[in-house]
Regions:
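N-terminal accessory interaction module
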Residues: 101-192
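Short, charge-rich, low-complexity alpha-helical interaction segments
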Residues: 1-22
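Hydrophobic/aromatic side-chain positions at a characteristic register within alpha-helices
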Residues: 36-37
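Solenoid-repeat scaffolds in large eukaryotic assemblies
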Residues: 32, 43-45, 79-80
Length: 192
């Protein structure tokens, strides 16, 4: 593992520990943390989201966005996205970030947002947005010949509605790409 990959993994581990800390019971939090420790992130995310829903625990918008990115990173967004979106909001903290369930907003052709050259088959699926300014983090998927979107995103695109400002593209193959894209939406728009 190269240094950059090790740093990205360590940073993701810190987010994981913070998310596990959302669970009030030490046994639950330890179970989720244990899943990270043994490399069973998919199972840990299922336990975490399941317990958040079962116990009707409040989840603020920042944690919900981190859960979404974590689920996307570990390939379980398709199974857990609905639950993540359904987690009870934290009434003590006004929501600035909104996580979209797949299908809540229609995918848009990438060529309508990104400069040329862009594949005509690439679609941007709105995923996380800033409620204040509308800045959107979208997952870029290929529209396959069988008329479905590719399972994994090729990249992450942060863009403003109406094309104000240049879009930023984060290639999935880059370490920490989804986290970097989330940071732009969370910290870079000035609404936070």
């Amino acid at each position: 593992m190269n240094d950059r990959r090790a740093q990205a993994y360590a940073a993701e581990g810190a987010v994981w520990a913070r998310l596990a800390g959302l669970l009030p019971g030490a046994d639950d939090a330890d179970e989720v943390q244990g899943c990270w420790d043994i490399g069973e992130q998919e199972a840990g995310l299922e336990v975490l989201v399941g317990r958040l829903l079962e116990q009707e625990l409040a989840v603020d918008d920042a944690a919900r966005a981190e859960l979404a990115v974590m689920a996307g990173q570990w390939g379980v967004w398709d199974r857990l996205g609905t639950g993540i979106v359904a987690c009870r909001p934290d009434p003590a903290r006004p929501a600035r970030l909104r996580v979209y369930e797949d299908g809540a907003e229609p995918p848009v052709p990438a060529w309508s947002v990104l400069p040329d050259p862009v594949s005509r088959e690439l679609r941007l699926v709105p995923w996380i947005a800033c409620a204040g300014c509308g800045l959107v983090l979208a997952r870029a998927h290929t529209y396959e010949e069988w008329e479905e979107l590719s399972y994994l995103a090729q990249s992450y695109v942060v863009h403003a509605p109406g094309g104000s400002g240049a879009p930023r593209v984060f290639e999935r193959a880059e370490d920490g790409a989804a986290w970097s894209a989330l940071a732009v939406v969370r910290d870079g728009c000035g609404c936070g």
